[in-house]
Each structure stands twice: as C-alpha cells, then as structure tokens.
A protein has these predicted regions:
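Phosphate/NTP-binding elements of NTP-utilizing enzymes
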Residues: 1-166
C-alpha cells in the first residue's frame, strides 16, 4: 500500500488498510511507519501520524490510513485502494459482509480503484466472508468463473496431502 501511496496520481486520494482487530491494525501500520522513518527521502515526503495510524504524502495530500474494523470506522470510507487484512478473522465477525461492502463501496466512482484481500489460514474451517471469497477465488482460478478483474493468488496444500495428514 505504500507503493500505491507513493505512485498515486490522484490529488488527495485515500488508501485504506482494514484490519479485523486493533492488534492486526498495529501489525499493518507499524512496518509502514518504520519504512518512512528509516528512509530520509520517504521521511521528507511523508508525514506519519501514529495516533491515528495515518501516513500522508506531503505533495499530493494522499493518505494511507489503517483502521480496525468497526461499523463506525468503516462508514463513509472513499478509498481508491483498500487492503482487507486477515480475511479469515472477518469471517468470524457478525455483519462482516455489510462492513466490507461499506468499506469498498466508494470504489465505484474511481476507475483506477482496487481491493486486495490478504489472509493466512484459520485453524478452523473457512467461515463467513472468508469462505465466500475463498470459494470465489478458487472458482476463478479453476476456470468455473470468468472474472478478468479478479486475480486469485492462493497457496493451498494439495488435497491428497491434506487428506493424508502429512
């Protein structure tokens, strides 16, 4: 998301990392913050506001904001790019589907807009929005669904390996 922030051409664009918990939000924000602080050029170009988990490009006024998912923090987001982090945890949350729909709703008016879903695997079977997105990604990967705007990058152990318990 830092690359998107730096290469963005739209004045005052917004980028969002949506995390399912405060802990995951901190894990997403801290490396970006440290990247800026440890590079003199980036430090000159970007302002880091740790208390609101926001990095602002000083020239374009573009922001990268990391938010912990809550219906109150997600409403009204108008991002050009959104990264949904740890989707499997959203799968356990009540009304997560509505919250994610609200978070990416602003993309309709931005032709260059994008959404990235990232996750690790749960110890439990996939559930909720995680299960839905995982199945959709598998169907695109396997050619059951044609969606040229959706690129699934999935690492899964081969079914025979999972079944054997190796």
């Amino acid at each position: 998301m830092m690359t998107a922030l730096l290469l963005n051409w739209r004045q005052a664009a917004g980028y969002t990392i949506l995390a399912p918990t405060v802990e995951v939000a901190a894990n997403a924000f801290n490396p970006a913050r440290d990247m800026v602080r440890r590079d003199d050029d980036l430090d000159d170009l970007c302002q880091v506001q740790t208390h609101i988990r926001t990095i602002t490009h000083r020239v374009t006024d573009t922001t990268l904001k990391v938010v912990a998912a809550d219906p109150n923090t997600v409403s009204g987001i108008k991002s050009v790019g959104t990264l949904i982090d740890e989707l499997w945890l959203f799968g356990k949350q009540y009304k997560a589907e509505d919250m994610l729909r609200e978070a990416i709703g602003g993309l309709a008016s931005r032709p260059e807009g994008f959404v990235v879903y990232t996750t690790t695997q749960s110890n439990e079977p996939p559930a909720g929005v995680f299960r839905q997105k995982l199945q959709y990604a598998r169907d695109v990967r396997d050619g059951k669904i044609h969606d040229p705007h959706f690129l699934p990058v999935i690492f899964e152990h081969p079914p025979e390996m999972v079944e054997s318990g190796v």
